[in-house]
Curated annotation (Swiss-Prot):
Family stated for the protein in its record: Belongs to the MscS (TC 1.A.23) family.
Span of chain positions assigned to the transit peptide in the UniProt entry: 1-86
Listed GO MF terms: mechanosensitive monoatomic ion channel activity
Keywords: Ion channel, Ion transport, Membrane, Mitochondrion, Transit peptide, Transmembrane, Transmembrane helix, Transport
Compartments, record wording: Mitochondrion membrane
SUPFAM superfamilies assigned to the protein according to its UniProt record, in alphabetical order: Mechanosensitive channel protein MscS (YggB), transmembrane region, Sm-like ribonucleoproteins
Protein name: Mechanosensitive ion channel protein 1, mitochondrial
InterPro entries referenced in this protein's UniProt entry, alphabetically: LSM_dom_sf, MscS_beta-dom_sf, MscS_channel_2nd, MscS_channel_TM-2
Disulfide bonds: none
Principal subcellular localization: mitochondrion
Transmembrane residue ranges: 152-172, 216-236, 238-258, 280-300, 305-325
Gene this chain is encoded by: MSL1
Organism this protein belongs to: Arabidopsis thaliana (Mouse-ear cress)
Membrane topology field: Multi-pass membrane protein
Cellular component annotations (GO), alphabetically ordered: chloroplast; chloroplast envelope; mitochondrial inner membrane; mitochondrion
Lineage of the species this protein comes from: Eukaryota, Viridiplantae, Streptophyta, Embryophyta, Tracheophyta
Length: 497
């Protein structure tokens, strides 16, 4: 049926004039489309109401593709099966609508069109701006050349003062807006449940940048004004190194402020323990020294000083200096190593070789201890790199061991005494039972006495409490021995007296 209609349309198209072909053909096609979608088809089911209402709005123009949204694949195939131009036009208008990915392709094409339009608009605006500036620059240059005072004094001073006012009034507000936007963006990027602590502006990256940037702009502005006011007093060759040095110092100042803010926030966090806090403090000191050294060398290079040559020449003499001061350098390196490894901290009781005491100060070259007699002892840091360090304060438990001599005549009662002493130790709340069980056994038998050894682990406690607990354990053990009628012995051999 569709083929018959196509034949009729083609015969009518041949009979009309060429200049009216497009218009008449469009009208016939519109009529044919309405007839096709009205639902009175002889070779197919009745069309849906949505298709009828949609197809009734179709209008074909002489420059548009017919049946662009008809959406009937069989009709498209009937027209596209012919080899003439008209059938190819109809097929090209229908083929895209029958594809399920048409909407996605349309959106991609629209996005490309919008992007291309934006690029063209920006390019055109830039071109027009460049043309206007090219036209205005000669006139402005001619005006400034005719007014030397305006060109040499008023305009530079005005621009300099404007930049200074911008740095002191407008820039802090812009930096605060950047800080607010950064905090909001970080909150959006962080996953749900992740702790997001609000950082105040004064302790943020932007807060650390504010003062160095303001003072740098102000310094450059006044240096520029001074060079204009007194060009003979301030030589031109000194202006560029001065500005470079100011930029370097401002950068070092900014890095130091930012580093201080970050470390302060880290130390204020509750998740940092004692050892981590000490490491962060050490990192703070080392980074400060490094920033100072880098800033000093960069400033010297900016001022024309050949730092590399100085370091090369100084390296030769540095070898001899290193041999002469190897003890000092050894103490310094050992101090830096201890700052990072942290074998002990302030307040710990340590023992290194023959030195024992409580740590009261840790320096870069020496460490101060307080010995048992409460005398301060100054120990070189190089000693700790060659000795075994025992840190008593970090022990999770303390072991005690005591030996009690008994009379040799009471050996039969020792097994019963040992069992009762072990039960007494197990029932003590200050005895640590996690690693080793308390023990009490006969460790030595001599001619005149027998020796009973008592040992256990105590929980972590202070020195005074440790001594009191040890005394309590010994007194309880003596009570058990006395209860069984056993007398304490002596380790001296009376036969030799």
């Amino acid at each position: 049926m569709a083929g018959v209609r196509l034949s009729l349309l083609k015969s009518i198209q041949r009979s009309i004039k060429p200049h009216a072909t497009a218009k008449s053909c469009s009208g016939l096609l519109n009529s044919h489309a309405r007839a096709f979608t009205c639902g009175n088809l002889l070779d197919g089911p009745k069309a849906s109401p949505s298709m009828i209402s949609f197809s009734s709005n179709i209008r074909l123009h002489n420059d548009a593709k017919p049946f662009n949204y008809l959406g009937h694949s069989s009709y498209a195939r009937a027209f596209s099966s012919k080899s003439d131009d008209f059938g190819s036009i109809v097929a090209s208008g229908v083929t895209g609508s029958g594809d399920g990915n048409g909407n996605g392709n349309d959106w991609v094409e629209k996005a490309k069109d919008v992007l291309q339009t934006s690029v063209d608009a920006v390019t055109e605006t830039a071109k027009k701006t460049k043309d206007v500036s090219d036209e205005m620059i000669p006139h402005v240059q001619q005006f400034l050349d005719s007014n030397p005072y305006l060109k040499d004094v008023i305009v530079p001073v005005s621009l300099t003062m404007t930049g200074t006012l911008f740095a002191w009034v407008v820039m802090p507000r812009i930096l605060r807006r950047f800080h607010t936007y950064a905090m909001q963006s970080s909150a959006k990027l962080l996953p749900v449940g992740f702790s997001n602590e609000d950082v105040p502006y004064e302790k943020s990256f932007w807060g650390a940048l504010e003062d160095p940037a303001r003072y740098l702009v102000t310094f450059i502005a006044f240096a520029q004004i001074a060079a204009m006011v007194a060009p003979t007093t301030i030589a031109a060759q000194y202006f560029s190194p001065t500005v470079k040095g100011a930029v370097i110092l401002s950068l070092v100042w900014f890095l130091y402020r930012w580093k201080t803010n970050v470390i302060t926030r880290m130390l204020s966090a509750k998740s940092f323990g004692g050892l981590d806090r000490e490491k962060v403090l050490t990192l703070d000191k080392v980074s400060s020294v490094g920033l100072f050294a880098i800033g000093l060398m960069a400033s010297a290079e900016a001022c024309g000083v050949a730092v590399q040559s100085i370091l090369t020449v100084g390296g030769v003499g540095g070898v001899a200096t290193a041999f002469a001061a190897r003890d000092i350098l050894g103490n310094v390196l050992s101090g830096l190593s201890m700052q990072f490894s942290r074998p002990f901290s302030m307040g710990d009781t340590i023992k290194a070789g023959s030195v024992e005491g409580q740590v009261i100060e840790m320096g870069l070259t020496t460490t101060s201890l307080l010995n048992a007699e409460k005398f301060p002892v100054l120990v070189p840091n190089s000693l700790f790199s060659s000795q075994v360090i025992v840190n008593k304060s970090r022990a999770q438990w303390r072991a005690i061991a005591s030996k009690i001599p008994l009379q040799i005549d009471d050996l039969d009662m020792i097994p019963q005494i040992s069992n009762e002493i072990k039960e007494m130790l197990r029932s003590n709340t200050k005895v640590f039972l996690g690693k080793e069980a308390p023990h009490c056994y006969l460790s030595r038998v001599e001619k005149s006495f027998a020796e009973l050894t008592i040992g256990c682990n105590l929980i972590r406690m202070g020195k005074e409490e440790l001594y009191n607990t040890q005394q309590e354990v010994l007194l309880e053990a003596v009570k058990i021995i006395k209860k069984h009628g056993v007398s304490l012995g002596t380790t001296w051999d009376n036969s030799t007296l």
